[in-house]
């Protein structure tokens, strides 16, 4: 387990699967560990696609989650909160960063996971910059 302000940074370079397909198993593992997740994307389409994918991820189980934009949602109670804003309102241990979402290297999470598609050159470049910064700080 990492210290506050010293999260472990993990990077997922997606080449053969979509982010929505890859996110389900990762989120399931986080929840099995008792971790809450803040899933951050600046792209409203991605947030909607992830929400839809999590509803149908596994026929045998349900991944509890909510979108911060949903009317009447108590964001603080969501085990997985899908949001545009990087504010940790659900007291998550893990930040899942998508589509070039920003997060300080010394964020107050136990783990920061960056998922990026190989075909998206700008996002891939940003992920490389984050990797270098996290690596230089000894957080990878």
Positions of predicted regions on the chain:
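Glycine-rich, aromatic-bearing surface loops/beta-hairpins
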Residues: 111-140
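Structural motif
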Residues: 15, 41-44, 97-101, 117-118
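Terminal and domain-boundary regions
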Residues: 5, 33-36, 50-59, 63, ...
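Short, charged/polar "capping" segments at the starts of alpha-helices
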Residues: 45-49, 122-123
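Short, solvent-exposed amphipathic alpha-helical segments in soluble enzyme
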Residues: 26-29, 54-58, 112-113, 129-133
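Helix-adjacent hinge/juxtasegments
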Residues: 52-92
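Long, hydrophobic N-terminal alpha-helical segment
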Residues: 1-47
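Active-site-adjacent structural patch at catalytic or cofactor/ligand-binding sites
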Residues: 78-115
């Amino acid at each position: 387990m990492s210290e506050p302000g010293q999260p472990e940074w993990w990077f997922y370079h997606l080449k053969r699967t979509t982010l929505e397909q890859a996110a389900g198993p990762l989120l399931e593992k986080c929840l099995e560990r008792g971790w809450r997740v803040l899933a951050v994307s600046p792209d409203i389409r991605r947030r909607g696609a992830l929400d839809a994918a999590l509803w149908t991820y596994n026929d045998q189980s349900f991944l509890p989650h909510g979108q911060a934009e949903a009317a009447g949602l108590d964001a603080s109670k969501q085990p997985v909160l899908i949001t545009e804003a990087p504010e940790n309102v659900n007291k998550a241990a893990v930040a899942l960063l998508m589509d070039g979402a920003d997060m300080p290297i010394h964020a107050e999470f136990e783990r920061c996971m960056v998922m990026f598609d190989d075909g998206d050159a700008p996002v891939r470049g940003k992920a490389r910059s984050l990797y270098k910064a996290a690596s230089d700080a000894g957080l990878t």
